[in-house]
Amino acid sequence: MAPCLFIEIRFNKIFMNMTNSVLDCIKTRRSIRRYKPEQIKDEELQAVLEAGTFAPTGMGYQDPWIVAVQNPEIIAKLSEMNKKFYTGAGDPYYGAPTIVLVFGSSPEKWRNSTNDGTLVLGNMMIAAHSIGLGSCWINREREMFATEEGKALMKQFGLPDGLVGIGSIALGYPASFPPTVKPRKEGYFRVIK
């Protein structure tokens, strides 16, 4: 894998090369909604999961819990659970062979749990794209894992009590790519000096 960031250090000043692979990965990543059926390699999964563990967390607390699911029966169960809160048609995970779930403490226990888990998901999606995998952010995990069925599944995963679902990603080899990049909206950011 090519390094994602070029940093040149001179006289204790850091100069970043403004065209680098990290920025390219961020700008070219897209939500993939069609996957090839073959499973991703173990080392690819490990790279994506490890990238998630390096996401920033409030006060370095490392609250999120990451669960990767490749068992087809459990994926089918997750899909059925998600459909109960899904208004679309078809598989909410788009047939991906791997689902990565992120959990965190309840907001009453740790106020940054949703923020921390979201950063984990973002890191994993960018990492996936950087090694040629496709991913798509999937919602409704909070509702899914608040059910009795969801709580039983969290126990099966060996997770501690008191966690809530933050989100998940569908993960696999892309079967197709979005044809165009939507232009960024005008006035997306402001710089105040």
Predicted regions and their residues:
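N-terminal polybasic/positive-inside topogenic patches
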Residues: 7-9
